[in-house]
A protein has these predicted regions:
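Noncatalytic alpha-helical scaffold of FAD-dependent oxidoreductases
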Residues: 1-287
């Protein structure tokens, strides 16, 4: 890491465990470029799984999909992948690449497990989905079929972007409250008239509502930003966070005080002030 004064800092090490001093690696990773410039990173690779199994399920209603997720979380299985797509996302993917997805489905869930118990785990997830009223639920341990099912989720971002400009949101809630968040997003979309394609990582409660912008007028942008703030407010009411992956950036700087108290903000400002007193790094962003 290159610091604001030009000094070079190396963090971390080759050991599996290391608690000598503060965890500076995580501090700089999470700083959005406000504390230093990361010029290199060393990663540890994990071996490819020797066996995978994949499942997919569709639901006619949002409520049924949420019941399935609650059942999956309660079942104790720990899939390596647990993703969801709403109807807007399903249709975007199907418009982009014909995959014979059910356009009438309100929710699509895709899960994948690996290891010796992979098929047993996805079979358990299939049962949870069937018990919740899935219109379709199937599993496979064939790698080619699994790759085809996963492709639908991987195409979601490209398919949504192909439709037109969007604001991509990034919010996360406790998994037990994910259903409430999805319901709130659907309500906000209906009330505002802004179409929202929601896709996300159900396994950790992190979703990405994509707000479609019919045009780039100031009025449309203002409406969309107000909708994004409503989603963040709903997220905080569910004990969540306004960002799970993408960071605060510029858009959410003004909303950060809704989540962090004055002490937390002051500590972060003090850290930044100590490392970059002149505000040279990523100006206009931060705390």
């Amino acid at each position: 890491v290159v610091l604001a004064d030009g000094k070079v800092l190396r963090t971390g090490g080759r050991t599996v465990k290391n608690v000598a001093g503060l965890d500076l690696t995580q501090l700089f990773i999470g700083s959005e470029g406000t504390l230093g410039l990361i010029t290199s990173a060393t990663l540890r690779l994990r071996p490819l799984p020797v066996r995978t199994a994949t499942m997919v399920a569709t639901f006619d209603t949002l409520e049924a999909g949420c019941r399935a997720l609650d059942g999956i979380f309660a079942s104790g299985v720990t899939p390596s992948v647990l993703e969801l797509m709403d109807q807007e996302t399903i249709n975007a993917v199907e418009d982009h690449t014909r995959m014979d997805l059910d356009r009438t489905a309100a929710v699509l869930i895709i899960a994948q497990a690996d290891g010796v118990d992979a098929l047993r785990e996805v079979d358990t997830i299939v049962t949870c989905c069937e018990n919740a009223g899935a219109s379709l639920a199937m599993a496979t341990d064939d790698p080619a079929e699994g790759a085809m099912l996963m492709q639908a989720r991987r195409l979601a971002g490209h398919a949504i972007a192909a439709i037109g400009p969007t604001i991509i949101e990034d919010v996360v809630v406790p998994r037990s409250r994910l259903g409430e968040l999805l319901t709130a997003i659907a309500r906000i979309s209906a009330e505002s008239g802004i179409r929202i394609a929601t896709v996300g990582h159900a396994g950790d409660g992190n979703v990405h509502p994509n707000l479609y912008l019919p045009d780039l007028s100031d009025a449309t942008r203002s409406t969309a930003i107000a909708v994004a703030e409503q989603i963040c407010t709903a997220t905080l009411e569910l004990d969540g966070s306004i960002t799970g992956e993408h960071g605060v950036g510029q858009l959410k700087m003004g909303w950060l005080a809704q989540q962090l108290d004055s002490t937390a903000l002051a500590v972060q400002a003090a850290i930044r002030g100590a490392l970059d007193p002149q505000g040279l790094l990523n100006p206009g962003r931060g705390y």
